[in-house]
Structures are given as C-alpha cells and as structure tokens.
Curated annotation (Swiss-Prot):
UniProt keyword NADP, yes or no: no
Stated name of the protein: Large ribosomal subunit protein bL32
Taxonomic superkingdom: Bacteria
Gene Ontology cellular component annotations, sorted alphabetically: large ribosomal subunit
Keyword match Ribosomal protein: yes
Species annotation: Campylobacter concisus (strain 13826)
One of the GO BP terms on file: translation
Amino acid sequence: MAVPKRRVSHSRAAKRRTHYKVTLPVPVKDKDGSWKMPHRINKTTGEY
C-alpha cells in the first residue's frame, strides 16, 4: 500500500496548489446583440 514517507508541509502544499488557477467564464455576444455565457440557452431567443 502506498504511504507517504513524511508529512507535506503547509508551504510545500501551497506551492503545489499555485498552479491550480480558476479561470473566469467569458460571455459572448449573441446574434441579437445580447451577452450570454457560452454553451447556455439564450433566454430572449431560445437558441443554444
């Protein structure tokens, strides 16, 4: 069974976690000129 040899320090774990960044979703302009999130149904036109 795989067991770590020693405990990972808080600073080392935080340094590893710096690479996991959250990206903000970018809204796109629809055919009718309204802004919507990509891959969502537009409430005004009903298009995907």
